[in-house]
Amino acid sequence: KGIREIIRQFPDTQLILLDDAFQHRYVKPKVNVMLMDYSRPVYDDSLLPYGRLRESAHQVNRADMVVVTKCPAGLSPLSFRLISKKLGLMPYQKLYYTSYSYGSLMPVFPEDSPYHADLAALTARDSVMLVTGIANPRGFVRHFRSFPFKVVVNHFPDHHDFTRSDIEELKNKFLTLKGERKVIVTTEKDAVRLAYNPYFPSSLKQFVFYIPVSVRMVAETEDNDLAGDLMKILG
């Protein structure tokens, strides 16, 4: 219904991208791209409610392209081969690997933040309080634990709207956190929710940062031109 409405309103539309539509059989896409989190491979998961899958892992065979996301740095060639073997893809299916590249800390409240935070400058005497409201924060947390400073994690459910009590709890935790220097760091998604949260105290705004994330192809693998291959299929 939504696709028909798009075509009706915008008849010149040439491309429609759907998110999380793999299980909708009424839609017959020209290309199916399936994303698989490196830390939660489908071959080690189960159907709901026992696991997280909405479909059998065998449905991977319907994908034209499979992208393994959030790969940690330094994966060995053997690791890539094991993933490929366990997926058991058909010859017509393409397999890609991507990883996150983390940028420098950015203030969530730039007008209230004269304070500059640099992760590389923080030491074991400093503390970082993480605030996440995403489905799988493992990679995010792993990045910060690679530094010498103390890391305290506050994880909320995916798409969480922070309540007054949530904010009050975070404030109290931050105020009692030990460290010569201390900051609050959140994800880009959660930064938007915090920036417009009416309960966030002005006294903490200068200490709140988010870390930009970009996605890059893992160059060490045979197939690393996803965009080019996709354009070939689409014609």
Where are these regions (language model features)?
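Phosphate/Mg2+-binding loops and adjacent switch elements
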Residues: 1-91, 97
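Short, conserved loop/helix-junction motifs that constitute active-site signature segments
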Residues: 27-28, 57-62, 88-91, 120-124, ...
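Short, charged, surface-exposed secondary-structure boundary motifs
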Residues: 43-52, 106-109, 161-165, 216-227
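Short secondary-structure boundary segments
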Residues: 70, 187-189
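Beta-strand-loop-alpha "switch" segments that mediate conformational coupling across diverse proteins
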Residues: 95-106
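Short, flexible loop segments at boundaries between secondary-structure elements
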Residues: 101-103, 157-161, 203-234
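Redox- and metal-dependent alpha/beta enzyme cores, enriched for Fe-S-associated oxidoreductases
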Residues: 110-111, 123-164, 229-231
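A short, acidic, amphipathic alpha-helical segment used as a generic capping/interface helix at domain edges
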Residues: 162-182, 191-192
